């Protein structure tokens, strides 16, 4: 019975690994080969079934022959996937328990007086509990170990703000950024830099995606090659790159790289030196502006660096505005003293000189 239970457990574990095998995860390949060899061994012990054992060895050989096919280092942790695998494995364990009881009962009715190996329903229940404990434990261990491995080995997790800002400063001395580049200094993103193609992107992981803010910065003549390189880098760890807010002039590069598009909105830029409110269109705006100025409100732009007193005032305003909510970050920015001190600050003060 030990070999029978072990064979069942190994089969369920291989079923669990099927998703990771399909995803070409390197660790799944190693475990699968080990489980197949053990399965072949216990199949022989269970009933000296040479045909089944040979078939498992053939499958093992195919795995070994396709070793290079499994190239991914890791996969993103997902509670949904973990729970789904636990439910699927439990379904098969319950199916084993009830079908085993039914088969034994039918066999006993046909062959009265024959002693059965599992003579009572409790034997199947006890076996199911044991198998559940082992298989579910394996699922939890498998996912948590991968999560721990990711924390230790994902290359971007070791990046510090100083490292990111130095890399960004260096590339911006040669190439211009875009309207979103300054948000990288908010410190809530990681970067990927290609020294070969002289390009850089800022991104943040979310579920199985690496969300990239804007277009790559640097030598845009190498953009297509860089997009391919970054996709291969993300794919190595089981992620998919997603680009947020890209420039229209680069759409052909993204299209040729196989990306699909989803329009969320449009962006408008205004040349301030040519901007005027003298028209019927801005009548309501002028009225509001004049009323605020009459009430003592004043708009001004302060050059950096800013005093600690000013920073503390705007931090108070920021906290009052947020309330119990959290900072959005990413493309919307967040309150960060170092980030604020990197650029001019636009403020509105009331008649008492307080920032509102």
Predicted segment positions?
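Topology signature of small-to-medium multi-pass alpha-helical membrane proteins
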Residues: 1-158
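A conserved beta-strand-loop-helix scaffold within acyl/acetyltransferase catalytic domains
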Residues: 3-7, 41, 149, 153-215, ...
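Short intrinsically disordered coil segments
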Residues: 74-79, 282-289
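Conserved acetyl-CoA-binding loop-helix of GNAT-fold acetyltransferases
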Residues: 220-232, 242-243
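Alpha-helical scaffold elements within enzyme catalytic domains, especially in hydrolases
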Residues: 229-233, 253, 291
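A glycine-rich helix N-cap at a beta->alpha junction
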Residues: 266-267
């Amino acid at each position: 019975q030990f070999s029978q239970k072990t064979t069942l457990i190994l089969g369920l574990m291989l079923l669990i690994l099927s998703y990771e095998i399909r995803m070409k995860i390197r660790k799944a390949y190693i475990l699968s080969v080990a489980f197949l060899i053990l399965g072949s061994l216990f199949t022989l012990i269970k009933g000296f079934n040479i045909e089944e054992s040979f078939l498992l060895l053939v499958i093992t050989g195919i795995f070994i022959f396709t070793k290079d096919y499994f190239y991914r280092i890791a996969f993103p942790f997902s509670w949904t996937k973990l729970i789904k695998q636990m439910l699927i494995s439990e379904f098969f364990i319950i199916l084993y328990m009830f079908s085993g009881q039914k088969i034994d009962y039918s066999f006993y009715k046909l062959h009265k007086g024959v002693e059965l190996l599992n003579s009572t329903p409790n034997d199947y229940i006890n076996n199911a509990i044991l198998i559940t404990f082992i298989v579910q434990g394996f699922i939890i261990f498998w996912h948590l170990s991968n999560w721990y491995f990711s924390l230790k080995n994902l290359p971007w997790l070791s990046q510090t703000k100083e490292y990111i800002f130095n890399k960004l400063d260096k590339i911006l001395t040669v190439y211009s950024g875009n309207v979103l580049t300054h948000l990288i200094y908010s410190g809530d993103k990681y970067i990927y830099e290609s020294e070969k193609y002289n390009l850089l992107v800022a991104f943040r992981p979310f579920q199985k995606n690496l969300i990239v803010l804007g277009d790559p910065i640097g030598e845009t003549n190498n953009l297509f090659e860089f997009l391919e390189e970054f996709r291969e880098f993300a794919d190595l760890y089981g992620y998919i790159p997603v680009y947020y807010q890209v420039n229209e002039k680069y759409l052909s590069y993204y299209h040729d790289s196989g990306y699909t598009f989803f329009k969320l909105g449009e962006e408008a830029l205004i040349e301030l030196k040519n901007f005027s409110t003298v028209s019927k269109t801005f009548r309501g705006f002028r009225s509001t502006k004049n009323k605020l100025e009459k009430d003592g409100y004043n708009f001004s732009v302060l050059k950096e660096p800013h005093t600690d007193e000013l920073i503390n005032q705007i931090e108070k305003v920021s906290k009052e505005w947020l309330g119990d909510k959290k900072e959005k970050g990413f493309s919307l920015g967040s309150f960060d003293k170092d980030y604020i001190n990197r650029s001019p600050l636009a403020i509105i003060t009331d008649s008492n000189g307080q920032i509102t």
